[in-house]
């Protein structure tokens, strides 16, 4: 058409039709003029090849600085970002316009493509069923999940079979550790019903942090023994090279997005307790596995048979109960019944609990505490363990190290704050300790807390005598109840004379 450039496609059409038609017919079919057709027959070159190279239409703002300053900077620091080079050039040459950033970034990218260093290559792998399982941990802090209104600082242990895409996730309250790995891995293997030939994890650098050489060797041996129990060969990807675990790293993002969407549809990120949140995670993972159900069923026959029983998924430590009525373990102080003072206890550390044994007898289970990120010690206190001694020395409550952890519910702390503000310290401590003792003796912790809340909301102080009358009345003042048993003849009358005659 007049006024339009001839395209390469039009020339190809013309040359095609020219093999069987005249110049005029071929030109008409290619939508070009007769004169253009005769000219194209002589040139035998595509129109795009006849275009002269496009030159610059405006001055090059980097003409005097790129080779002289930018290139030496790129050679000296190959990993430097283009935006850092841009800021440095503006600092050196304030007269440069700020709009050169994109030009500089394109020029640096082109220079690196020609003169840059060789980059690491990722080699895609083919996978066989039943061959490889992957484990990793992912941080769930960005989801802002809360338990009973309190933020839940937790990780998610994530296991995945590479071939079928089977997944298992387990909520971890502490950081990365062998205990968390052992518990999560065994749950995953027993859930799928078999074990792969190889198990790959990262270098477990977080679990090895702050350990001495002997402890690191012990942890390595325990990990190898765990894999040997399930006849798996342990492998590790190189430290800091996430793409070597890419089959699970990418799955982290998909799983977290699924959890985030489920939380949005749920309408709240708060859960009543940890058990309900774990059930919520299990349901999401189950739905994801259902989408790969056929492939998972196809991989199961290729998995190794599981052993008869699980192996240990805990650490065992021996502690001695001190005169303070508890023991310190991993920067956390735990209270135990005072009758255990002086005894040596075996403690099994799980991710979320401690099982306490004396000899081979299980004594009690304690929730596991965590030291603060700043290194400050924490306490796990059960007031039932110390209340009998505290009643003898109520003033010890005033400056007690773990006073804040002693109160089983916020209402008791509110009551103590109100009492200490309006009464002498000795009287306030005495009343608070007696309130805790009342809850301990009568098993009315929740009911007493509700009554304290009503009293404090009415801007009154707790009345110990009145509360004792409600929850712990004096047995001597209880009314005598006389129970009169009914005569058996009255029951026979209810049965009727006809039935009585038949029985006779």
From Swiss-Prot:
InterPro entries: Integrase_cat-core (IPR001584), IstA-like_C (IPR054353), RNaseH-like_sf (IPR012337). Residues 36-60 are annotated as: Disordered. Residues 125-309 form the Integrase catalytic domain. Keywords: Plasmid. This is Uncharacterized protein y4jA/y4nE/y4sE. GO terms for biological process: DNA integration. It comes from the Bacteria. It comes from Sinorhizobium fredii (strain NBRC 101917 / NGR234).
